[in-house]
């Protein structure tokens, strides 16, 4: 079993963990339908930037 040679300091541990934070998704509201969607993505209704781009 692998065992560390030297104890990692609190500083080293925290520096490693500095990249582990979660970020919230950038959610936008469509102008035409008022539906929430991810940025740069088409809504479920087929709208993108206020225009109908997909016909169902």
From Swiss-Prot:
Highest taxon in the source lineage: Bacteria
Disulfide links within the chain: none
Keyword Ribosomal protein in annotation: yes
Signal peptide positions (record): none
InterPro entries for this protein: Ribosomal_bL32, Ribosomal_bL32_bact, Ribosomal_zn-bd
Keywords for this protein: Ribonucleoprotein, Ribosomal protein
Ranges of Basic residues composition bias in the record: 7-16
Transmembrane feature ranges: none
GO biological-process terms attached to the record: translation
Molecular function as annotated in GO: structural constituent of ribosome
Record-linked Pfam families: Ribosomal_L32p
GO cellular component: large ribosomal subunit
Region (Disordered): 1-37
Record bears the keyword DNA-binding: no
Cited PANTHER family: 50S RIBOSOMAL PROTEIN L32, LARGE RIBOSOMAL SUBUNIT PROTEIN BL32
Stated family: Belongs to the bacterial ribosomal protein bL32 family.
Protein name in the entry: Large ribosomal subunit protein bL32
Organism: Pasteurella multocida (strain Pm70)
